[in-house]
Amino acid sequence: MDISRLRNFSIIAHIDHGKSTLADRLLEFTGALSQREMQNQFLDKMDLERERGITIKAQTVRLTYRADDGNDYVLNLIDTPGHVDFTYEVSRSLAACEGGLLVVDASQGVEAQTLANVYLALDINLEVFPVLNKIDLPAADPERVIQEIEEIIGIDAHDAVLASAKEGIGTHEILEEIVKKIPPPKGDASAPLRALLFDSWYDQYQGVIILVRIFDGTLKKGDRIQLMATRSSFEALKVGVFAPTMVETQQLAAGEVGFVIAGIKEVADAKVGDTVTLQHRPCSSALEGFKEVKPMVFSGLYPIDTVQYEQLRDALAKLKLNDSSFSYDPETSLALGFGFRCGFLGLLHMEIIQERLEREFGLDLITTAPTVVYRVHRVTGEVQSIESANQMPELQHVEYLEEPFILAHIHVPNEFVGGVLALCEDKRGVQREIKYLTQNRVMIIYELPLNEIVLDFYDRLKSITKGYASLDYEHLDYRKSDLVRMNVMINGEVVDALSLILHRDKAYYRGRDLVSKMKELIPRQMFEVAIQAAIGNKIIARETVKAMRKDVLAKCYGGDITRKRKLLEKQKEGKKRMKNVGNVELPQDAFLAILKVE
């Protein structure tokens, strides 16, 4: 295989800008798929990816294309996830390429996620060229979008390809540009093997399948390979390429992209970003850029029906096989029974995992409010990381608390700026800058505490801007904050599943909203139920659910007041006794209400 005829590229685009459809057109045009095999969004293998129109795992496909100069080229398309939670996966997929297509919707212009991924690509010196998609739409305005790309991203866009993936316009021009503009890979096939592992997933028959991009050396079937970060070694049982279905080959040489099946049992052993080398002839240094991905958002998952606990455990273990960035530990709650504390990269990641559990494994789950990782500095000087309110020590042992901050880039149309600024201020944000990108698009940059974002920030941002805003964020650092733990008590008993860690300024309002919401949801009992929100020993809000009572005076017509009083006193005594022994069943909705309180 002549290395000068190879091209490795990826497609960078915001959600819904037509990336997967464009990939379909490229597959069709180069004859990788016949009309019969063609299905929309071929590369998005999971139903959920297809349904939400997002790419979650990276996929690769090898296309052969005869260019106008008469030569045959091999093009490796590496499809990247386009969502903010999966930034690390994107950066590894991009590191496996020499160039990228920047796909921008000709009617919507540049969005926040596009920017984040383009900057990742430009940071590692990829050759990026723009493609304007959806030019068949009546609202398409290529002139404006070209100007936007040049002003915001700073790459030359005057000769951008105009295309419509849906109609198949411009596919040939895109392939020609890939051949002309993207440089061939560099690499020495005789050097020791150095390959980047940029994705892995679990197959129930063959174990873990890893995707690699070979930078130096050659990987043959039967070689013993070593993964440098985990120091584990395996035998390469099969090597090959996706064209777009799996095709086995004898070897993969420098510059090529392909898969390796090596009998690896768990995805945790094949970490994304790791360097693959040969055991008997290892390379001198690993490829740079590897990092351990740490969960940032935590939430408790409990089965509604306790019988499903075992099923939930098996389901989580299966998902973990495929997704090493997700973590789970068993935990118990007095109110909810047995469940798991799960860690996710971000909100979208959390939603996807929950949906997959409910859809693929048929589980009914209840989810506690998401929290982030706080740092507790104790009086003794030790620092402890906590991810749920129940782990927080008593206040007298705590010197101060720190919470994680993020830097958010929000793109909005001009008319919504006021509403978005008000939302960010309400969420304790610190304004960095406001940039007018064009006459009607604004980029707002804010520093925000992560725990304000995990609850409902994204939903509220979308509703304020009628769905036009796009958000991208990166993690900054930990900062000292006045955080407290708020407990919810029912008849004096603390309900552990409802405890929250939040900022002292917000505790009073949040507590008041919470107890009034709970009052609506808890059914009336035969005795009165007190619902209280407390910080330490101080009660900050209270509501009472009145008792149901029988009319004990119904049978007294007229008669003496003392007789009536005796009956009422007797009833009161009974209610008191009942309150001591009675316990309140909390309905399922009560926990969901916590998530919904604005």
From Swiss-Prot:
Primary residence: membrane
Tell me one GO molecular function of this protein: GTP binding
Q: Does the keyword tRNA processing apply?
A: no
Q: What class of enzyme is it?
A: hydrolase
State the Pfam families in the record.
EFG_C, GTP_EFTU, GTP_EFTU_D2, LepA_C
- What CDD domains does the record point to? EF4_II, EF4_III, LepA, lepA_C
Q: Which domain of life is it from?
A: Bacteria
Instruction: List the InterPro entries hit by this protein, alphabetically.
Output: EF-4 (IPR006297), EFG_III/V (IPR035647), EFG_V-like (IPR000640), EFTu-like_2 (IPR004161), G_TR_CS (IPR031157), LepA_C_sf (IPR038363), LepA_CTD (IPR013842), LepA_IV (IPR035654)
Q: Which BP terms from GO are recorded? A: positive regulation of translation
- Which UniProt key words apply to this protein? Cell inner membrane, Cell membrane, GTP-binding, Hydrolase, Membrane, Nucleotide-binding, Protein biosynthesis
Entry's localization field: Cell inner membrane
Domain tr-type G: from-to ranges? 4-186
Q: Which reactions are catalysed by this chain?
A: GTP + H2O = GDP + phosphate + H(+)
CC per GO annotation:
plasma membrane
Question: Where, by residue number, does GTP bind?
Answer: 16-21, 133-136
**Its Enzyme Commission number?**
3.6.5.n1
Bilayer topology = Peripheral membrane protein
Q: Does the keyword Nucleotide-binding apply?
A: yes
Question: Briefly, what is this protein's role?
Answer: Required for accurate and efficient protein synthesis under certain stress conditions. May act as a fidelity factor of the translation reaction, by catalyzing a one-codon backward translocation of tRNAs on improperly translocated ribosomes. Back-translocation proceeds from a post-translocation (POST) complex to a pre-translocation (PRE) complex, thus giving elongation factor G a second chance to translocate the tRNAs correctly. Binds to ribosomes in a GTP-dependent manner.
Q: Which family does it belong to?
A: Belongs to the TRAFAC class translation factor GTPase superfamily. Classic translation factor GTPase family. LepA subfamily.
Q: What protein name is recorded for this chain?
A: Elongation factor 4
Naturally occurring in which organism (per UniProt): Pelobacter propionicus (strain DSM 2379 / NBRC 103807 / OttBd1)
Tell me what gene encodes this.
lepA
